[in-house]
Regions:
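Ala/Thr-enriched low-complexity intrinsically disordered regions
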Residues: 1, 14-17, 29
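Low-complexity, intrinsically disordered regions enriched in charged/polar residues
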Residues: 2-5, 182
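Short hydrophobic alpha-helical segments enriched in small aliphatic residues
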Residues: 5-8, 24
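Nucleotide-activated chemistry modules centered on ATP-dependent adenylation/adenylyltransferase
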Residues: 29-234
Length: 234
């Protein structure tokens, strides 16, 4: 039978060992007992929750969704993603908890100083959300926590994992790790079937600027190229 492994003192990571792509820390259990695990699943959005929930349920785990994303801006975008996460939870018949505080000012206070750091605002953003998830899990008698952030092929996966493991140790709660990226296309297909809102940027105003400024520069280069071609034809 497959085992879920909770390793002690980072031994397996130190050895570079990965067992079936997932780890749970600080104890050992067999797969049947996973159905009794009380797991808090941080949800970055509805679409990114599709495959993780499917995989967890396949493994006999029934998580509780937890929406805490102070990085999402502007307000209408945050509200859209919150309601979309709630819609997903309702359609999936999954328990759902949401922190409905909109924290633009707090985010900017944290993000602007982080711009000058080596790993920058992304590390700050991961840490803020994963720490709050670990804290909530610890305070509300959850056995473990995870995040749909580990589904995204665009996030800094190993950095997030290290951050989550640190907070698991700090708050005395297990971190359930699984590389959900293997189900990337499956999650996309499921989100479309459920008619979920599929956002075009990570969430923060900085990522929005980066995405659309790149698009604008690309469009400008295309226009300049066309103007040059027309001048040569004249």
């Amino acid at each position: 039978a497959s085992l879920h492994v909770r390793h002690v003192g980072g031994l397996l990571r130190a050895l570079g060992t990965s067992i079936w792509g997932f780890h749970i820390h600080n104890m050992m259990t067999d797969k049947e007992n996973c159905s009794e695990m009380k797991l808090l699943m941080h949800m970055c959005c509805g679409p990114c929750s599709c495959y993780p929930l499917k995989k967890l349920r396949t493994d006999g785990i029934e998580p509780t969704g937890y929406f805490f994303n102070p990085n999402i801006h502007p307000y209408k975008e945050w509200e859209e993603r919150l309601q979309n996460a709630r819609k997903f939870a309702e359609l999936s018949e999954m328990d759902f908890i949401a922190d409905e505080a909109y924290s633009l000012r707090d985010f900017l206070k944290k993000a602007l100083p982080a711009e000058g750091m080596r790993k920058g605002r992304c590390q700050m953003c991961y840490a803020w959300r994963l720490e709050q998830t670990a804290k909530y899990a610890s305070e509300h008698a959850f056995d473990a926590f995870t995040s749909t952030l580990f589904y995204s092929i665009y996030q800094q996966h190993e950095l997030m994992r290290a951050v989550a493991e640190d907070f698991a140790a700090s708050y005395g709660v297990s971190f359930y790790y699984e590389d959900f990226r293997i189900g990337w296309q499956d999650g996309i297909d499921l989100s479309k079937e459920m008619d979920l809102y599929r956002q075009s940027y990570c969430g923060c105003v900085f990522s929005e600027e980066e995405r659309y400024s790149r698009s604008l520069r690309k469009l400008q280069r295309k226009e300049n190229k066309e103007k040059k071609r027309l001048r040569l034809m004249a």
